Amino acid sequence: MKNQTNQPSPAVIMQIGSGFWASKILLAAVNFELFTHLARKESMSAREIKDLLKLNCTDRHLFDFLDALFCFGFLKRDGFLETAQYSNSLDTGTFLDKEKTSYMGGMLEMMNNRLYGFWGNLEEGLKTGLVQNEAKNGGEPIFESLYKDPKLLKGFVNAMTGIQIGNFMALAQKFDFSKYKTFLDVGGSAGILSTMVAKYNSNMSCTTFDLPAVEAMANETIQKFEVSAQVKAVSGDFFTDSFPKADVITMGNILHDWNEENKLMLMQKAYDALPDGGVFIAIESVIDNERKQNVFGLMMSLNMLIETADGFDYTFDDFNKWAKQIGFKSTSSLGLTGPTSAVIAYK
């Protein structure tokens, strides 16, 4: 986002500097489940929304809130102030209605409930190099605490599902799985990627591999999408256990959680579990090699500072270097949706 003129302007500075205002307006609407309520009723007046959500602000401030969502394109509006009827836009009706399988609000819920506050400590994170999440004040590291707290774990799993489901669908359709028979998703969480691969590729036998705490969620996903004949959930620890053998092995938003040493260790374990001709695929917000376009990838990498201290997102050149170091024959990249890509290593 740059000033395209030769004249100085504060516009972009103020747009970014006040960006947390816009962010919090959307996050509050998601937290209120506003878009889900609107999907049920098709349209509502401000008064109906105020009563349903039990809001005690002035009518004027409620109009400000709803009309800001309208200006952002998240709501449609027919009428004005007291006469206005509000309804979902195409995007929010598709992706922020909790009753649709396309719901991606889990990530926004986690941003609102956890990350919004933690990012207030970005300066401290940059100064100290230390995590700024629950572990900051003597708590356990993020993944240890997640898997011990069912409520926190469910929120995290829903967040990861929300941010990746579109990318998983894209990979399942864009990558040529016709040459392969078996598929393993390491750190598979709720099993969405394995489910999508099975749904779009009847030739594939899929395994979602993660800690025992998420096996029930994965089985629930498998049943929901009616792919139990093709997909199974297997419990294991990708740090301490060998990976099950498979023709294609994936990791979705896994490598970026760790430092380079652990990234290489995980890629080596994938290499060892693949046959000759097998494929390893990492799905991430891969940063462009020149580090000047994928700003979301850069922000995601800073989020790793907040959450893990030494995890980081990376470029395709980084991935290519690591893959060759391990022994993969070649690499390629496949764009998915938005800022996310699949980086692929062939054994």
Task: Label the model's feature ranges.
Residues 1-77, 91, 177-178, 182-347:
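Alpha-helical subdomain
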Residues 2-4, 10-40, 48, 52, ...:
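Conserved Class I S-adenosyl-L-methionine-dependent methyltransferase catalytic core
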